[in-house]
């Protein structure tokens, strides 16, 4: 999925911002969260997040649900590199495995399982 954030901000600017964030808040992860383009789910009001590294993927999903005011019976799926990350995984481990070369972690969300492949949970 193509990131609008990447389209709107040049690489050097994104990289410098991510580095500044990581220096100032070493226990936080810079995340860009965007809606999958053709999804019928609500658009989020804020793309940029500074996430505690010990937050789980499931807790991050909860934050996103609240931001888009998604009712409990509606489904939401989040994707990292077009794959569903395990809900119990720590955001720090997802960041280390999937961060972009600019230093941000790009997450997309959808009301449907667009890509449909789950990451294997490491035991």
UniProtKB/Swiss-Prot annotation:
Keyword Cell membrane: no
GO cellular component term of the entry, any: fungal-type vacuole membrane
InterPro entries on file: Atg8-like, Ubiquitin-like_domsf
Post-translational modification note: The C-terminal 7 residues are removed by atg4 to expose Gly-116 at the C-terminus. The c-terminal Gly is then amidated with phosphatidylethanolamine by an activating system similar to that for ubiquitin.
Gene3D superfamilies hit by this protein: Phosphatidylinositol 3-kinase Catalytic Subunit, Chain A, domain 1
Biological-process GO terms, alphabetical: autophagosome assembly; autophagosome maturation; cellular response to nitrogen starvation; mitophagy; protein transport
Gene Ontology molecular functions: phosphatidylethanolamine binding
Subcellular location per the Swiss-Prot or TrEMBL entry: Cytoplasmic vesicle, Autophagosome membrane; Vacuole membrane
Disulfide pairings: none
Record key words, sorted: Autophagy, Cytoplasmic vesicle, Lipoprotein, Membrane, Protein transport, Transport, Ubl conjugation pathway, Vacuole
Positions of Phosphatidylethanolamine amidated glycine lipidation: 116
Principal place of residence: membrane
Membrane topology recorded in Swiss-Prot or TrEMBL: Lipid-anchor
Pro-peptide region(s): 117-123
Site feature: Cleavage: 116-117
Domain of life: Eukaryota
Main function: Ubiquitin-like modifier involved in autophagosome formation. With atg4, mediates the delivery of the autophagosomes to the vacuole via the microtubule cytoskeleton. Required for selective autophagic degradation of the nucleus (nucleophagy) as well as for mitophagy which contributes to regulate mitochondrial quantity and quality by eliminating the mitochondria to a basal level to fulfill cellular energy requirements and preventing excess ROS production. Participates also in membrane fusion events that take place in the early secretory pathway.
Family indicated by similarity: Belongs to the ATG8 family.
PANTHER family given in the database record: MICROTUBULE-ASSOCIATED PROTEINS 1A/1B LIGHT CHAIN 3-RELATED (PTHR10969)
Official protein name in the record: Autophagy-related protein 8
Species for this entry: Sclerotinia sclerotiorum (strain ATCC 18683 / 1980 / Ss-1)
């Amino acid at each position: 999925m193509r990131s609008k954030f990447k389209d709107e901000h040049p690489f050097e600017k994104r990289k410098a911002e991510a580095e500044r964030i990581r220096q100032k808040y070493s226990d936080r992860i810079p995340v860009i969260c965007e809606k999958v383009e053709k999804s019928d789910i609500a658009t989020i009001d804020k793309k940029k997040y500074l996430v505690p590294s010990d937050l789980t993927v499931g807790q991050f999903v909860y934050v996103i649900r609240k931001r888009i005011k998604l009712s409990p019976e509606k489904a939401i799926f989040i994707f990292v590199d077009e794959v569903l990350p395990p809900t119990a995984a720590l955001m720090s481990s997802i960041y280390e495995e999937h961060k972009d070369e600019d230093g941000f972690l790009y997450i997309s969300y959808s009301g449907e399982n667009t890509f449909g492949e789950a990451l294997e949970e490491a035991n």
